[in-house]
Amino acid sequence: MIITSLLDTDLYKFTMMQVVLHHFPAANVEYRFRCRTPGVDLVPYIDEIRDEVRGLCSLRFVDVELDYLRRMRFIKSDFVDFLALFHLNEKYISITPSPKGNGEIDIVIEGPWLHTILFEIPVLAIVNEVYFRNTQREPDYREGRERLREKIKLLGAKPEFADCKIADYGTRRRFSKVWHEEVALTLRDGLGPQFAGTSNVLYAMKHDITPLGTMAHEYLQACQALGPRLRDSQIYGFEMWAKEYRGDLGIALSDVYGMDAFLNDFDMYFCKLFDGARHDSGDPFEWGERMLRHYEANRCDPRTKVLVFSDALDIPKVMQLYERFRGRCKLAFGVGTNLTNDLGYVPLQIVIKMVRCNGQPVAKLSDSPGKSMCDDKAYLAYLRQVFGIAQPVEEDASK
């Protein structure tokens, strides 16, 4: 079985799930799967994927896992008590061949948000591992280890990068769970203090690594349906987050509606309240410069704030960003696929995104064309109008 623990997921799933329990326990949602890599035939592996998901739904949290979560300063005891009773229910997920007949598969997760939020990460990890264990029956781990050593060597070679730290954000697109664990341990041992931690809660617990994560796009997307007014949904999301965490876990995700809309909403109050912001699409250099100017304009010293970069990073790009912004702010870098699925094979670009909440469409308007995902063109156009965002040519609804 690929997933053997419900902790084998990203920390931000638990931090968001706690908000859902306390503030949105009645919300119902729908998620859909998409493979952005052209020409990939996943249909032959449907039965294997279903079997693995069935195994996932048989799992429960065990006492040692619950105790670990309970020790986190921002996790409340009633949430851990809820998790002690929790399991994923197979009735909320369906996996079928796409009617398009082109090798794509449809994975639909639909049900109470509180009971479906933990599906996404392990299901993506399952799809990845099932695909690669069938297409690469004798993995070239030697090549993977050599590439990983070169990355560690590159980051650790220059004294001026001694304070440049990276984190593992690679659970969802990892080659396999065995390889992921080896990567995390190799980074811990090879980078020392330059390894900031991992988003994977299981490996954090097992190997005494710092777990990292705050919020994901789905949280702010859901607020489109849960908040009082669509135009204020991003503000509402940040306010509810602050209501739950009271200043803790203060990294705001910036690209659900694009950078312009984020800066309009992220006023002096949020600039001072939140520790920083996370970049996940668009030009990271331009984004960083705009964030620093925004902090200064809102009477915040940028040197006290954290800029988190997590969009398709590799080590050279991390180093370029560090060179640009070091000394001007605090920096954090989350590296995903380039760490956990770099053995010489083409990684799958797969996602599971929320598309509805309480029966209403929800969407992400990314700073990167092609990253937006919404199955309702009329709603997408309306959302752009509300937030004053031009429609890019790549997403012309007439196509």
UniProtKB/Swiss-Prot annotation:
Pfam families: NAPRTase, NAPRTase_N. One of its GO terms (biological process) is NAD biosynthetic process via the salvage pathway. It catalyses: nicotinate + 5-phospho-alpha-D-ribose 1-diphosphate + ATP + H2O = nicotinate beta-D-ribonucleotide + ADP + phosphate + diphosphate. One of its GO terms (molecular function) is nicotinate phosphoribosyltransferase activity. GO terms for cellular component: cytosol. It comes from the Bacteria. Pathway: Cofactor biosynthesis; NAD(+) biosynthesis; nicotinate D-ribonucleotide from nicotinate: step 1/1. SUPFAM superfamilies: Nicotinate/Quinolinate PRTase C-terminal domain-like, Nicotinate/Quinolinate PRTase N-terminal domain-like. Keywords: Ligase, Phosphoprotein, Pyridine nucleotide biosynthesis. Transiently phosphorylated on a His residue during the reaction cycle. Phosphorylation strongly increases the affinity for substrates and increases the rate of nicotinate D-ribonucleotide production. Dephosphorylation regenerates the low-affinity form of the enzyme, leading to product release. Its EC number is 6.3.4.21. The modification Phosphohistidine is found at H217. InterPro entries: N/Namide_PRibTrfase (IPR041525), NAPRTase_N (IPR040727), Nic_PRibTrfase (IPR006406), Nic_PRibTrfase-Fam (IPR007229), Nicotinate_pribotase-like_C (IPR036068). NCBIfam families: NAPRTase, PRK05321.1. Catalyzes the synthesis of beta-nicotinate D-ribonucleotide from nicotinate and 5-phospho-D-ribose 1-phosphate at the expense of ATP. Belongs to the NAPRTase family. This is Nicotinate phosphoribosyltransferase. It comes from Burkholderia orbicola (strain MC0-3). The gene is pncB.
